[in-house]
From Swiss-Prot:
Active site (UniProt): C75, C219
BP-aspect Gene Ontology terms: lysine biosynthetic process via diaminopimelate
Keyword Cytoplasm: yes
Enzyme Commission code: 5.1.1.7
Residues holding substrate: N13, Q46, N66, G76, N77, N159, N192, E210, R211, G220, T221
Subcellular location: Cytoplasm
Species of the source: Nitrosococcus oceani (strain ATCC 19707 / BCRC 17464 / JCM 30415 / NCIMB 11848 / C-107)
Catalytic activity as recorded in UniProt: (2S,6S)-2,6-diaminopimelate = meso-2,6-diaminopimelate
Pathway assigned to this chain's UniProt record: Amino-acid biosynthesis; L-lysine biosynthesis via DAP pathway; DL-2,6-diaminopimelate from LL-2,6-diaminopimelate: step 1/1
Protein name: Diaminopimelate epimerase
Length: 276
């Protein structure tokens, strides 16, 4: 079966996006791994599917698969690419979209300047919602790592995140601590790991080790997680520029019980087809 796809990227975080409306398909984990393979397939951090809406008030379904073949709940950079894809493909003429993810409904706004703003939903801090194994909720937690105690914040942005504050992201132990924290037994569904350097109340630098993908140039949910953890700790304001290796995202959050809004670019790289 030959499937048409579009290769897209948001701040260097790259995706293979497939219209599963006009060409219905159900991908196996091995097919996802093959598509994502940078030597044998197309190559990407994640595979995104546009699927039929399941509710009248929803425009599309949005499914997300990591490069390791596992389906995940949310991806912010992917959501921006998703929004641009459905407009470019002529699947909608709307500027505001409501899409269904595995973690709930999100709103996507296509701005006149080409940026895309995403309602990433309300962050969840309750340990059972992350999920994170701990007796009670707190603003920060101590984990043992490499024989030392490491202080983290934990939050769900539709997918689990932990955030560490570091003096400088350039020298942060991302390659070593990233996989150790990703698979830490206190996170039963594994976790995305953010290494955050606070530059000023309105500016942070961030590197993210993504669950199932490793370090990537950018992570939208990771940027949201770092911004909300930083605001909760009193380090950051409600409007923050987040600089990742791939570029800058704007994050706005007014506080507990409010949605996080993320703004950034989405670009088409090329189009093609692949035999599955």
């Amino acid at each position: 079966m030959r499937i048409a796809f579009t290769k897209m990227q948001g701040l260097g975080n790259d995706f293979v996006v497939i219209d599963a409306l006009s060409q219905p398909l159900s991908l196996t984990a091995s097919q996802v791994r093959w598509i994502a393979n940078r030597r044998l397939g197309i190559g990407c951090d994640q595979v995104l599917l546009v699927t039929p809406a399941s509710l009248p008030a929803i425009d599309f379904g949005y499914r997300i698969f990591n490069a390791d073949g596992g389906e995940v709940e949310q991806c912010g950079n992917g959501a921006r690419c998703f929004a641009r894809f459905v407009r470019e493909q002529g699947l909608t003429d709307k500027n505001v979209l409501r899409v269904q993810t595995a973690s709930g409904i999100i709103e996507l706004q296509l701005e006149t300047d080409g940026q895309i703003t995403v309602d990433m939903g309300v962050p969840r801090f309750a340990p059972h919602q992350i999920p994170f194994k701990v007796d009670q909720e707190a603003d920060y937690y101590s984990l043992e790592l490499d024989g030392q105690q490491v202080e983290i914040g934990a939050v769900s942005m539709g997918n689990p995140h932990c955030v560490l504050r570091v003096p400088a992201v350039d020298t942060a132990p991302v390659a070593h601590w990233g996989p150790l924290l990703e698979s830490h037994p206190r996170f039963p569904q594994r976790v995305n790991v953010g290494f955050a350097q606070i530059v000023s109340p309105g500016h942070l630098r961030l590197r993210v080790y993504e669950r199932g993908a490793g370090e990537t140039p950018a992570c939208g949910t990771g940027a949201c997680a770092a911004a909300v953890i930083g605001k909760r700790r009193g380090w950051l304001s409600g409007q923050v520029n987040v600089d990742l290796p791939g570029g800058r995202l704007g994050i706005h959050w007014e506080g507990d019980g409010k949605s996080v809004w993320m703004s950034g670019p989405a670009e088409i790289v090329f189009k093609g087809s692949i035999e599955l």
